């Protein structure tokens, strides 16, 4: 398709900036109403920010406010706890390999039911209650996300190979907030389960978003002493992974940020979704929150 974005990594930028300068670099580009006209912001939404009622309501309020300020918002949501709950009721065992859910055909049916039905529509409804015009879609709609099986041991878990952003672009132009469930179409049209961080980063790159914000349950990337690192580049991320400081669930988050930057996104951030109005404070008030990822 003409609008499809190839996800093959671009050449790395050799001119790394020191992480201690990253927040200042990004603050000068923050949205100012007139300084940046209708910036596109792709948000990975999940964790406590989505599961805890008081945080989810606050997030919906902030999202509606940001949309009212002229930001073009795209939300990609997770739904792991809800999937596990349904599988338990169906007496299907939940198994994970390296943090990824092993997905056979029965599990995939449950995944698609929960993500595209239950969770997607609940998120859309929450946003609508607070005045945001949201439209729920999945990665299979309009050929948005295409993928191939990631690893035979994982079953129907996919890695994204291409993104066609035509559908979310149409929704954005019409004034809607696209809310995307991370399910993709495989080579034979089969449904594939996609890590939500990965899907969101791929979409941010394909849309050439000004911001990719990954909402997490931690303040950002932490150093070996448990203190927040305000900014990181690719070389520093590689070193911290080798040292075991970046591990587990943080690995796909930083990789999603780097992939988004490689594919055309301007800036990426891992942000604490447990902090009240963290997204709004970062985008509108230049609050020094989270970890900024640069190439």
PLM features per residue range, with description:
Residues 3, 8, 13, 17-20, ...:
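Nucleotide/pyrophosphate-binding catalytic subdomain
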């Amino acid at each position: 398709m003409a609008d499809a974005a190839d996800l093959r990594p671009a050449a790395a930028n050799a001119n790394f900036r020191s992480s201690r300068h990253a927040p200042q670099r990004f603050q000068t580009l923050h949205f100012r109403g007139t300084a940046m006209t209708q910036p596109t912001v792709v948000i990975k939404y999940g964790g406590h920010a989505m599961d805890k009622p008081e945080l989810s309501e606050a997030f919906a309020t902030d999202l509606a406010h940001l949309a009212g300020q002229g930001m073009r918002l795209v939300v990609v949501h997770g739904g792991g706890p809800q999937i596990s709950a349904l599988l338990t009721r169906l007496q299907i065992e939940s198994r994970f390999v390296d943090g990824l859910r092993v997905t056979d055909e029965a599990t995939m049916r449950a995944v698609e039911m929960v993500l595209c039905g239950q969770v997607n529509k609940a998120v859309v409804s929450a946003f609508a209650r607070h005045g945001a015009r949201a439209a729920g879609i999945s990665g299979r709609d309009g050929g948005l996300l295409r993928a191939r099986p990631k690893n035979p041991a994982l079953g129907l878990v996919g890695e994204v190979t291409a993104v066609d952003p035509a559908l979310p672009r149409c929704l954005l132009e019409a004034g809607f907030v696209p809310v995307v469930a991370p399910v993709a179409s495989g080579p034979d049209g089969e449904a594939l389960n996609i890590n939500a961080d990965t899907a969101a980063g791929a979409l941010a790159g394909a849309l050439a978003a000004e911001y990719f914000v990954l909402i997490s349950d931690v303040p950002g990337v932490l150093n070996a002493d448990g203190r927040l690192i305000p900014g990181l580049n690719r070389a520093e991320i590689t070193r911290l992974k080798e040292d075991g400081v970046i591990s587990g669930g943080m690995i796909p988050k930083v990789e999603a940020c780097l992939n988004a930057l490689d594919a055309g996104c301007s800036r990426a951030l891992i942000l604490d979704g447990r902090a009240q109005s963290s997204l709004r404070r970062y985008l509108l008030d230049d609050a020094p929150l989270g970890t900024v990822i640069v190439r």
